[in-house]
A protein has these predicted regions:
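Cyclophilin-like peptidyl-prolyl cis-trans isomerases
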Residues: 10-257
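Bacterial Sec-type N-terminal signal peptides, specifically the leucine/valine-rich hydrophobic h-region
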Residues: 4-7
Length: 257
């Protein structure tokens, strides 16, 4: 056999000899290597790109973007979503929103000058499932769906990202980066695009880049995010006053292939 990754017949033989676990691990390793190589290639291109290439830096909602309005007990948050760069996260979020999954859920974790987090039916950070859980094992085997990391999306102030319990464990929980601290001086333009470094001067959490799927950006309503971030919390970062999502209205949807 030339390779278990290129010939299905060889893969079958390998499965017989060494078992599914071994072959699946090798397939995953190969897929991860290819993804890393592709990301490195795209990152080099992104470093040379102009501002127009970074959708978070434009408040207008483009044709290939979606838009939602998160109505909370503290006010509204208007967000645009990026299916081009994070199709799984956007489809998951939009579907949950349309089905009312998030209605009534609380912001269970709030850390001022960091982020606000919601999307857990349990209300304590332990729950939440993707739309594919129990339905499509290729997208979610039971632990969540994969991270989608793009050199064109970052954890700048106002960005919407998937919360996870480790790589590729995305379910339904999400957070909005709220920090207003200037992090630009700690970033190198050899690794981060200059326009993004400038954006980080207004806040965000660059330490989260590469570990969490960014899939949206607040285009209005950051005052609501700041209001939520300023409430009194317990030692476990849970608001003493319950803050809930009333509803999430899909203003502009997206047709997935």
């Amino acid at each position: 056999c030339v390779s278990i990754l290129t010939l299905s017949g060889c893969e079958s033989i390998e499965r017989s000899l060494k078992g599914d676990r071994y072959v699946d691990q090798k397939l995953a390793e190969n897929s991860s290597k290819e993804a890393t190589e592709q990301l490195n290639k795209e990152t080099k291109q992104a470093l040379k790109a102009d501002k127009k290439a970074f959708p978070q830096l434009d408040k207008a909602v483009a044709k290939n973007e979606a838009q939602v309005l998160i109505k909370t007990s503290k006010g509204d948050i208007n967000i645009k979503l990026f299916p081009k760069y994070a199709p799984l996260a956007v489809e998951n979020f939009l579907t949950h929103a349309k089905e009312g999954y998030y209605n009534g859920l609380s912001f269970h974790r709030v850390i001022k000058d960091f982020m606000i987090q919601s999307g857990d039916p349990n209300g304590d950070g332990t729950g939440g499932k993707s739309i594919w859980n129990g339905k499509d094992k290729k997208k979610d085997s039971g632990n969540g769906f994969v991270n989608e990391i793009s050199p064109y999306l970052y954890n700048i102030r106002g960005s919407l990202a998937m919360a996870n319990a480790g790589a590729d464990t995305n379910g339904s929980q999400f957070f909005i980066n709220q920090s207003q601290q200037d992090h630009s001086k700690q970033l190198s333009d050899k690794k981060v695009p200059k326009v993004i470094i400038k954006a980080y001067s207004e806040g965000g959490n660059p330490s989260l880049d590469g570990g969490y799927t960014v899939f949206g950006q607040v285009i209005s309503g950051m005052e609501t995010v700041d209001k939520i971030a300023s409430v009194e919390v317990t030692k476990s970062d849970q608001p003493k006053e319950k803050i809930t999502i009333t509803s999430i209205k899909v203003i502009k949807g997206y047709k997935f292939k």
